[in-house]
Amino acid sequence: MPIRIPDQLPASDVLREENIFIMPLSRASTQEIRPLRVLILNLMPKKIETETQFLRLLSNSPLQVDVELLRIDDRPSKNTPTEHLDNFYRQFEMVKGRNFDGLIITGAPLGLVQFEDVIYWDHLKTIMEWANKHVTSTLYVCWAAQAGLKLLYDLPKRTRKDKLSGVYNHEIHNPYHPILRGFDDTFLAPHSRYADFSQEYLAEHTDLDVLATSDVAGVYLAATKDKRNVFVTGHPEYDAHTLHNEYIRDLGEGMEPVIPINYYPNNNPDNKPVASWRSHGHLLFSNWLNYCVYQQTPYDLDHFSEDNFTKDD
């Protein structure tokens, strides 16, 4: 089944060119199907690029998904036209009275900023707390994972000396966990962060199920036992060129970034990078939608209750 997005959203043309089935709202409104309602809180600067990346992953599912885009506040954006934000993004006040099947909170380039210094930190905490009462399952990505762990477990920020950048090998820890269904024993995924997520630290301070780790990158995937909060510390949504663009950006700003690991053929930035994580990203999002959202959410979202959810043993 397709994703349902506004007819004029720029991502529509990009995804159609990739032969991805997009159903405009004008057509979807004529079908008697209860789609999953998924909200994306987009914290990334280049919002059009980011929304397209996440919509691509959400599209590869037999479930029909109705996607709405959320902005953190009404401050002007340096990288996204105001017209785009006004036309396609909602403010929190417009959605806080509703319930949603799923919420995705994207990463943000705030790895070296203390939580209390993030200009929208209090507002983000409000949204995360709201999600616990209004959303079946929330997916926290990269920086949002660190923010979510701070809110839910009061974990302090742990920062690496050098930025972690590249494509790393990961090992799954519980092949029978629903989120990992269909995963290979090892898989590749990109990272671009300063945050440090060690398996020992999470095991000591949380009751999370640690699902996948890397010897170099640490914990990649973890979830609460009721699957209502899922944490992804990397960027499965990244396009093949995203790490390259970040590397070139940092060079242009006078920084001395390390060449992303295991990314360029022969470790040469002059070579075109290859996306070796695409199938994993699609499977991760498909499993999240199916096992964490669809199989747990009530048919009537007006009957949403925290008591509806059970924890796996």
UniProtKB/Swiss-Prot annotation:
HAMAP family: MetA_acyltransf. It is an enzyme of class 2 (transferase). Transfers a succinyl group from succinyl-CoA to L-homoserine, forming succinyl-L-homoserine. InterPro entries: Class_I_gatase-like (IPR029062), HST_MetA (IPR005697), MetA_family (IPR033752). The record marks 192 as: Important for substrate specificity. The keyword DNA damage does not apply. It is found in: Cytoplasm. It comes from Vibrio atlanticus (strain LGP32) (Vibrio splendidus (strain Mel32)). Substrate binds at residues 163, 192, 249. Its main location: cytoplasm. The active site is at residues 142, 235, 237. The record marks 111 as: Important for acyl-CoA specificity. GO terms for cellular component: cytoplasm. The gene is metAS. GO terms for molecular function: homoserine O-acetyltransferase activity; homoserine O-succinyltransferase activity. Pathway: Amino-acid biosynthesis; L-methionine biosynthesis via de novo pathway; O-succinyl-L-homoserine from L-homoserine: step 1/1. GO terms for biological process: L-methionine biosynthetic process from homoserine via O-succinyl-L-homoserine and cystathionine. It catalyses: L-homoserine + succinyl-CoA = O-succinyl-L-homoserine + CoA. This is Homoserine O-succinyltransferase. Belongs to the MetA family. It comes from the Bacteria. Keywords: Acyltransferase, Amino-acid biosynthesis, Cytoplasm, Methionine biosynthesis, Transferase.
